[in-house]
Amino acid sequence: MSKLLARAKAKRFSAENSYHNMALDDAYIDECCFNLQQAIEFSLKYLVEMSGEQYVENHDIRAQMNKLKRLNAFIPSEDKLRLYASTINSWKVETRYNDKFVALIEDINEIRIIADELIKYCESLVRIE
């Protein structure tokens, strides 16, 4: 079985830890955003694998979502995820290589919810099998 769900959960846990330390240093904002992006990416790739297919070999969450749509698979929070896709995708690189990276707390809070809903849905699939 794939380690993608375990990785998604670990990244989400790391994001939450960084979230609670954001007031200490901007580095925690970077870490929070990067780990949220990773949690969502791994969750979507997990859903593709659970649909019996190989996920798209890139970091663009829209590519995973488009593949899931072609497979007629359910995507939790799909509308919100599409709305925030550009922001989430940018966090993969911006948080690591852009010293002037800035994230809106409102975006972080919405994306935390999206990540939680995705992981919760993925976990429900494990229990069904």
Positions of predicted regions on the chain:
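Terminal alpha-helical segments
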Residues: M1-E129
